[in-house]
């Protein structure tokens, strides 16, 4: 007789294979059709609120794997808080202004055509470009299963948003922190604009390293008693025409050599080795004796004043620093102190202008020459004063967009002064920011010191740009006096116009139209400031325009979390902190989380030329979004994250194990209608174990340590749960009577674990969790329509005195012997065996549980049969023997008294089925 029909075999509609690339888009589309974000908001009304404020990606190009990592990590954190029972807010946004978009438009038009167009037309084309890529990126993010307020995102180019950026600027001006002054700033000659620190990238560059002798003038020669020269060292010969000083350190010892050179004593040996100085020390010189005396610039014969500055070191060079206040921050500072002339002979395109002729700095042939191309010619002009020249490779600042080396150039710019105090406050903006860093929680903790040191060392923030596509620094200036009009009514009226017409109004309307009626100002006396704001000011104001304005249902200010790549310590985290610190005197965030960058499996940066680029949409098409999401969760995001086909295959294998574990549970609880609370020893053990593991997982997730949490979950599934418990339950699940207490207890334990585990995986594997709910029996899903009706459900408190370490060791030693017996073909199945033992820990279990633990046909104190092996655990003897009874054709245990007969348990079950059927 075939007993298969009498077995309670697993049944589920949940498929073994996910077919993720085909099925995910359909389910995602359903989510967005029924607006699950709104559903999530409604289902947590009145609950504690969690706000993640989205750092805006740039509306240019398709998303790359770094974007995917960032948005998925945000999505996981938002969903984790949701499944924890909190109300959540996640309003996505885009950075829409700035140079990269303007460059794309310029590329399409060509520079000549762009220069012929009015600003309003250029801005219109930039707006179209940004809008196109907002649409593209929005769909790409949605295709990653990211749930957010996609219907009401924030765009920094929206009219009301532009008005709020402008209002934030006006608030800072009101605090007295906005200053306009001429100062050297990072200048991109290729893009013809000033740059902020965050827009500068360091790349290797080959530069001429030169040592130049500046002869001391008569007065200085008299002072030291000998004709001599001070040697300076520089890697920017092109700045020498603008030299107005030579800086020495007041605390360093200098020497005069017998061949007539003044250098730092500590660097003399090095300079001798290089053949620059040949003489020995003639006498020691105090730098203070040379202060305010002069040397002669060999390029043009102009006098160069000797000044003292703490910035001069003896790490390299000569101990004497060539000082051109128009070309460097330190030079500028020391120049202010000594009132040195600021010469700026370089135009916005990085070429020498007419200043070199007017001020007699260089011959006329240099006019119009790019400064970097002029280096060699300047070296030729130096003649004998050039003591040594060699090329060196060094790290040099480059423009983040054009990738061309930048220059320092003194121009009139707008700055946020970090060392000034906001109105009515004793603390400077820098002090406010540093205090707020101390109050902020950092994930990982090292982010605190990184942000702190950047704020400690940062200069004033240059917020003006000489470009077209951005929010204008919309102030009026009195033509005669140069005074800027900060009249609150004037500023408010401009903001109102921007809200209605966008900031294009600054370019399309006249001064008269921009002044409020009856302002009392004569439009003919005023001119517009035509600079635009640094794009980092836009994104630094998002808290103001999104969280404070209440135009968006985006959550609370300050936000619970800001989350971006580790490069944002110098970017968005800092700009947001400075804008918020200036206006609100506090940080706009309670916590900052940073992640590393994506690299290939060898740890190398991705590039098209290397062919190691992993595109998120390619991963989605090949493996499925769930695999990408699981990769994010299982990677240590605190350092750089490795991704490759190999790594994704391993992640896919882990996903398969997880999916199959859920499938097994669903298939085996399909006939369970109510969860019971009367459990056996093994059920209590697995429930207690699961509770402890799930609490650890939840704790790690709360600290955003998803990799540690998933590692603990995976270990539990592979080892104790799927590896032991589900295996030992198979006999009772398939062969016991439908309502047998052992069977129902195990099903109940599984249902509880499935429910609790579902809430834990849902933030990461939302698609799979939703699919599980769809196919789950009612005992698991209750009235849930989808996964968004769920919350993390803690397991009940269950006491277990099961000696896990002892029992797992016994099972493991037994299985080693079973493997040997199978290899030797002595047995085919462990059910052919029985165990004889005196172990009180094993014998304390009821007969069924101890048999199931080892998957044998009996475990007794004494069984007389053929011995096949033995082992010991903590001194207790276990003897493995051949089963003496016959194989039951239904359960395959060797417990039948006669050949072909059923064992006692199976006979009862079959009899019961026959009675029920008659």
UniProtKB/Swiss-Prot annotation:
List of residues binding Zn(2+): 888, 891, 903, 906
Superkingdom field: Bacteria
Motif 'KMSKS' region: where in chain: 605-609
Annotated GO CC locations: cytosol
Broadest EC class assigned to this enzyme: ligase
Details of cofactor binding: Binds 1 zinc ion per subunit.
The protein's Enzyme Commission number: 6.1.1.5
CDD domains the UniProt entry points to: Anticodon_Ia_Ile_BEm, IleRS_core
Gene3D superfamilies xref list: 1.10.730.20, HUPs, Valyl/Leucyl/Isoleucyl-tRNA synthetase, editing domain
Keywords assigned: Aminoacyl-tRNA synthetase, ATP-binding, Cytoplasm, Ligase, Metal-binding, Nucleotide-binding, Protein biosynthesis, Zinc
Required cofactor names: Zn(2+)
Binding site for L-isoleucyl-5'-AMP: 564
Written domain comment of the UniProt record: IleRS has two distinct active sites: one for aminoacylation and one for editing. The misactivated valine is translocated from the active site to the editing site, which sterically excludes the correctly activated isoleucine. The single editing site contains two valyl binding pockets, one specific for each substrate (Val-AMP or Val-tRNA(Ile)).
Subunit structure: Monomer.
Family: Belongs to the class-I aminoacyl-tRNA synthetase family. IleS type 1 subfamily.
Function: Catalyzes the attachment of isoleucine to tRNA(Ile). As IleRS can inadvertently accommodate and process structurally similar amino acids such as valine, to avoid such errors it has two additional distinct tRNA(Ile)-dependent editing activities. One activity is designated as 'pretransfer' editing and involves the hydrolysis of activated Val-AMP. The other activity is designated 'posttransfer' editing and involves deacylation of mischarged Val-tRNA(Ile).
Record's protein name: Isoleucine--tRNA ligase
């Amino acid at each position: 007789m075939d007993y298969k029909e009498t077995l309670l075999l697993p049944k589920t509609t949940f498929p073994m294979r996910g077919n993720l690339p085909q099925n995910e888009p359909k389910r995602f589309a359903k989510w967005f059709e029924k607006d699950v974000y709104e559903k999530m908001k409604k289902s947590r009304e009145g609950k504690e609120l969690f706000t993640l404020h989205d750092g805006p990606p740039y509306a240019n190009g398709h998303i790359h794997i770094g974007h995917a990592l960032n948005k998925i990590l945000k999505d996981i954190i938002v969903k984790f808080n949701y499944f924890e029972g909190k109300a959540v807010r996640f309003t996505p946004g885009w950075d829409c202004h700035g140079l990269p978009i303007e460059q794309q438009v310029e590329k399409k038009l060509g520079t000549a055509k762009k220069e012929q167009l009015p600003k309003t037309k250029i801005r219109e084309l930039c707006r179209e470009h940004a809008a196109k890529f907002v649409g593209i990126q929005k769909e790409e993010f949605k295709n990653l299963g990211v749930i957010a307020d996609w219907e009401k995102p924030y765009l920094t180019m929206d009219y009301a948003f532009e008005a709020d950026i402008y209002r934030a600027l006006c608030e800072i001006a009101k605090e007295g922190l906005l200053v306009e002054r001429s100062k050297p700033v990072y200048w991109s000659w290729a893009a013809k604009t000033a740059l902020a620190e965050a827009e500068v990238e360091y790349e290797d560059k080959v530069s001429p390293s030169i040592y130049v002798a500046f002869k001391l003038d008569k007065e200085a020669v008299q002072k030291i008693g000998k004709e001599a020269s001070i040697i300076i060292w520089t890697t920017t010969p092109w700045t020498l025409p603008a030299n107005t000083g030579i800086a020495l350190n007041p605390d360093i010892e200098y020497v005069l050599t017998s061949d007539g050179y003044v250098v730092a004593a500590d660097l003399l040996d090095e300079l001798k080795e290089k053949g620059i100085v040949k003489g020995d020390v003639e006498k020691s010189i105090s730098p203070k004796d040379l202060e305010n005396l002069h040397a002669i610039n060999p390029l043009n014969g102009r006098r160069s004043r000797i000044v003292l500055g703490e910035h001069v070191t003896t790490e390299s060079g000569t101990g004497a620093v060539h000082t051109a206040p128009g070309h460097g921050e330190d030079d500028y500072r020391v120049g202010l102190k000594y009132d040195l002339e600021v010469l700026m002979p370089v135009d916005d395109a990085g070429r020498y202008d007419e200043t070199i002729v007017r001020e007699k700095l260089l011959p006329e042939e240099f006019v119009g020459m790019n400064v970097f191309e002029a280096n060699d010619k300047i070296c030729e002009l130096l003649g004998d004063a050039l003591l040594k020249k060699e090329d060196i490779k060094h790290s040099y600042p480059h423009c983040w967009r054009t990738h061309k080396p930048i220059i320092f150039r003194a121009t009139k710019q707008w700055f946020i002064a970090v060392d000034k105090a906001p109105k009515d406050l004793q603390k400077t903006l820098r002090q406010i920011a540093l205090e707020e860093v101390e109050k902020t929680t950092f994930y990982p903790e090292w982010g605190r010191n990184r942000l702190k040191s950047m704020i400690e060392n940062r200069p004033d923030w240059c917020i003006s740009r000489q470009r077209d596509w951005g929010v204008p620094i919309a102030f009026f200036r009195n033509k005669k006096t140069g005074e800027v009009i900060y009249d609150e009514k004037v500023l408010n009226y401009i903001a109102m116009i921007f809200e209605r017409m966008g900031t294009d109004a600054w370019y399309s309307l006249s001064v008269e139209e921009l002044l409020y009626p009856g302002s009392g100002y004569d439009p003919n006396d005023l001119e517009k400031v035509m600079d635009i704001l640094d794009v980092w000011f836009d994104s630094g104001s998002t808290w103001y325009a999104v969280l404070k304005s209440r135009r968006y249902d985006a959550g609370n200010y300050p936000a619970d979390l800001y989350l971006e790549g580790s490069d944002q310590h110098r970017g968005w985290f800092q700009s947001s902190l400075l804008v918020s610190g200036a206006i609100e005197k506090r940080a706009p965030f309670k916590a900052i989380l940073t992640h590393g960058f994506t690299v290939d499996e060898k740890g190398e940066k991705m590039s098209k030329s290397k062919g190691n680029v992993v595109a998120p949409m390619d991963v989605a098409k090949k493996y499925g979004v769930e695999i990408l999401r699981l990769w994010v969760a299982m990677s240590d995001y605190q350092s750089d994250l490795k991704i490759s086909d190999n790594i994704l295959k391993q992640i896919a294998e882990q996903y398969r194990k997880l999916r199959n574990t859920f499938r097994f549970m669903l298939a085996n609880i399909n006939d369970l209608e109510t969860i019971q609370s009367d459990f056996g020893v093994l059920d209590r053990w697995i429930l207690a174990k699961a509770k402890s593991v799930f609490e650890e997982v939840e704790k790690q997730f709360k600290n955003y340590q998803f990799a540690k949490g998933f590692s603990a979950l995976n270990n539990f599934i592979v080892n104790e749960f799927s590896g032991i418990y589900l295996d030992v339950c198979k006999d009772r699940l398939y062969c016991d009577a439908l309502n047998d207490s052992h069977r129902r207890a195990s099903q109940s334990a599984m249902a509880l674990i499935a429910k609790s585990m579902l809430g834990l995986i849902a933030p990461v594997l939302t698609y799979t969790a939703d699919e599980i709910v769809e196919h789950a029996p009612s005992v698991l899903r209750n009235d849930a329509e989808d996964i968004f009706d769920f919350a993390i459900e803690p397991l009940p408190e269950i006491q277990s005195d099961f000696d896990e370490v002892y029992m797992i060791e016994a099972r493991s030693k037994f299985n080693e012997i079973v493997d040997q017996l199978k290899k030797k073909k002595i047995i085919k199945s462990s059910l052919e065996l029985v165990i004889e033992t005196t172990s009180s820990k094993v014998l304390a279990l009821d007969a069924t549980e101890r048999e199931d633990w080892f998957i044998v046909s009996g475990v007794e104190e004494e069984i007389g049969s053929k011995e096949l092996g033995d082992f010991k655990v903590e001194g207790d003897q276990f003897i493995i023997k051949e089963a003496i009874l016959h194989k039951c054709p239904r359960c395959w245990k060797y417990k039948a008294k006669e050949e072909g007969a059923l064992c006692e348990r199976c006979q009862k079950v079959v009899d019961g089925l026959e009675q029920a059927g008659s």
